Amino acid sequence: MEYGIVYLLTNPVMPGLVKIGMTTREDMDSRMRELYSTGVSVPFECPFACRVKKSDCAKIEKALHTAFSPQRVNANREFFRIQVEQALGIHVHIASLRISV
């Protein structure tokens, strides 16, 4: 079975913002290096990442984006003005359902 990763990222230079994203890479380090190379002044930190079926990755990411849409900073970006704990609660619940969202 193929897997993807749904993750939460924070950055000390962006307090109060959480990036909710996904990757089909095999590890988070690759994704975090890629994001750091996009002009962010310090590397992202990953307080949570969850390996899920690749076919569910985008669905789970979309469900999280929808759940936090009122707190979305920019419609074209995956950053939300929320606490990590808020995203963790919903993320863990959605990921544990083992059903298509």
Q: Can you name each region flagged by the protein language model?
A:
Residues M1-V101:
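Non-catalytic accessory segments flanking enzymatic or RNA/DNA-binding domains
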